Amino acid sequence: MAQRIVVTGTDTGIGKTVFAAALTDLLGACYWKPVQAGLAEETDSHRVQRLADLADDRLVPEAYRLAAPASPHLAARLDGVSIDPLCLNPPDTGGRPLVIEGAGGVMVPLTADTLYLDVFARWQWPVVLCARTSLGTINHSLLSLAALRSRGIAVLGVAFIGDANADSEETICRLGAVKRLGRLPWLPELTARSLQHAVAAEFRRADFAP
């Protein structure tokens, strides 16, 4: 089976999709967002395609496309849709790696009684945890790491996003016993080229090897 990496986060709106685009490009991977909630603006798949300059055949179609920009369990209810977590299984990517992006944080509910964490535990694929660098990140990051490990999920490391914060980054990695993969800074002009350069300066492909 081709390499598969799950990208999750400590919260929503922290830059997880931008990092997923960067990782997809770095690995020459395909990309899959199992559940897209919010269709009025650019979807996460389209944003990743633009920022990673992906051909259409490297985008795996979403299993569910929901109109409301909300937690998947609520967006599905508003659309009158029933999400079946057991159907969230990506197709074969022909030997190419696959980057899978969750929604929001680790504990976001997919249904009334199923969390994304439950799906990650069933998949048992390694996870990259995206964490912001601003105030409050230590608590959120350590709780997320504890939740993942409580279900036996391997964590490749933490990808920090935001302005440099050496103490918070070091504290999270030391207390969380986790690898620091790098830090993706805020980019004044976010393009495929600027993202590629930022990733090349901070991240190593070897750190994501199976």
Swiss-Prot record:
The active site is at K33. CDD domains: DTBS. One of its GO terms (molecular function) is dethiobiotin synthase activity. Mg(2+) binds at T17, E101. Pathway: Cofactor biosynthesis; biotin biosynthesis; biotin from 7,8-diaminononanoate: step 1/2. It comes from the Bacteria. GO terms for biological process: biotin biosynthetic process. It is found in: Cytoplasm. ATP binds at G13, I14, G15, K16, T17, V18, E101, G102, A103, G104, P185, W186, L187. Its EC number is 6.3.3.3. Its cofactor is Mg(2+). SUPFAM superfamilies: P-loop containing nucleoside triphosphate hydrolases. Keywords: ATP-binding, Biotin biosynthesis, Cytoplasm, Ligase, Magnesium, Metal-binding, Nucleotide-binding. The keyword Aminoacyl-tRNA synthetase does not apply. GO terms for cellular component: cytosol. It is an enzyme of class 6 (ligase). It catalyses: (7R,8S)-7,8-diammoniononanoate + CO2 + ATP = (4R,5S)-dethiobiotin + ADP + phosphate + 3 H(+). Homodimer. NCBIfam families: bioD. Belongs to the dethiobiotin synthetase family. Catalyzes a mechanistically unusual reaction, the ATP-dependent insertion of CO2 between the N7 and N8 nitrogen atoms of 7,8-diaminopelargonic acid (DAPA, also called 7,8-diammoniononanoate) to form a ureido ring. This is ATP-dependent dethiobiotin synthetase BioD. The gene is bioD.
